[in-house]
């Protein structure tokens, strides 16, 4: 019973997503990692129970994050003190952006897909998987970031271990989810959500994706659902623009055996933030496909770092 519950600041109420019942929550608040994992649970419960109020709450929270609380590298959580969400469009470039929050957001996205079957969920998840997640691990695989600010002054380094070592196991957790994220099956529909070289089996149905081709062998009559990423241009299936699109997926009646060619352009895109994001007035970012570019330069005097695009 959340009514008249006494507060214990600063670790209850909104901070702990404990300010009201889950079905009455409509925006992302409080500790970012705890929040996205709690919201993942909400979405999973809604998908299982088909509770309309819980479904609506999870959808509103997802939209709140995706539209106004998500940094361009696919991570969330602004404040360093309490590792929490900020207000809408409060997206400073020195934000905290904890690795665990990025992983948790991807997990929330996976649950939202179960709930909605909407391809747009994967635009957010794919951004996270291609940017904040790989950037949080060194090339050697033994140093990690706890936080991932978009802008530093050359004083930010990965650590070999941490007093709060929550990030490495969260990274392992998201890797374990990848098979369920790349492919999904619902009745006779098989969805290819992430264009990652892979093979999968659903009973007697075997599929693979490699070099832009989906190969299918099945005893069932299969309908392929090929996600059309938001960043993709000139998306084609077997050399043609898709004729049928459902919830962001190109629909292909593949039958029992098929080889389907998927083509799309990945142009270099210049992106500007929403005008409400004060921190990014007069700034741009560059992405190719789902990958965010990093601009860096070694300088003696940071005040002299000035360039124009």
Feature map (PLM): residue ranges:
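Glycan-recognition and catalytic cores of secretory/periplasmic carbohydrate-active enzymes
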Residues: 1-309
């Amino acid at each position: 019973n959340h009514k008249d519950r006494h507060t214990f600041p600063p670790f209850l109420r909104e901070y702990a997503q404990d300010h009201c019942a889950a079905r009455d929550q409509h925006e992302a608040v409080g500790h970012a990692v705890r929040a996205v994992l709690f919201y993942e649970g909400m979405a999973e419960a809604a998908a299982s129970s088909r509770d309309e109020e819980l479904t609506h709450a999870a959808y509103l929270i997802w939209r709140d994050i995706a539209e106004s609380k998500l940094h361009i590298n696919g991570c969330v959580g602004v404040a360093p003190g309490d590792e929490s969400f900020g207000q809408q469009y409060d997206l400073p470039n020195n934000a905290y952006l904890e690795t665990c929050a990025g992983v948790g957001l991807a997990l929330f996205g996976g649950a939202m897909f179960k709930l909605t079957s909407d391809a747009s969920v994967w635009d957010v998840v794919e951004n996270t998987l291609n940017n904040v997640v790989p950037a949080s691990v060194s090339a050697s695989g033994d140093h990690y970031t706890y936080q991932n600010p978009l802008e530093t002054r050359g004083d930010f380094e990965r650590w070999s271990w941490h007093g709060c070592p929550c990030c490495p196991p969260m990274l392992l957790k998201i890797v374990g989810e990848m098979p369920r994220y790349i492919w999904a099956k619902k009745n006779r529909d098989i969805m290819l959500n992430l264009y990652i070289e892979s093979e999968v089996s659903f009973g007697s149905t075997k599929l693979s994706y490699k070099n832009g081709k989906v190969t299918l062998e099945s005893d069932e009559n299969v309908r392929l659902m090929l996600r059309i990423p938001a960043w993709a241009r000139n998306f084609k299936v077997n050399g043609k623009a898709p004729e049928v699109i459902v919830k962001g997926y190109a629909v292909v009646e593949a039958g029992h055996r098929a080889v389907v060619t998927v083509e799309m352009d990945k142009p270099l895109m210049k992106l500007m933030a929403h005008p409400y994001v004060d921190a990014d007035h007069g700034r741009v970012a560059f992405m190719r496909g789902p990958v965010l570019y990093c601009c860096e330069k070694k300088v003696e005097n940071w005040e002299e770092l000035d360039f124009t695009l």
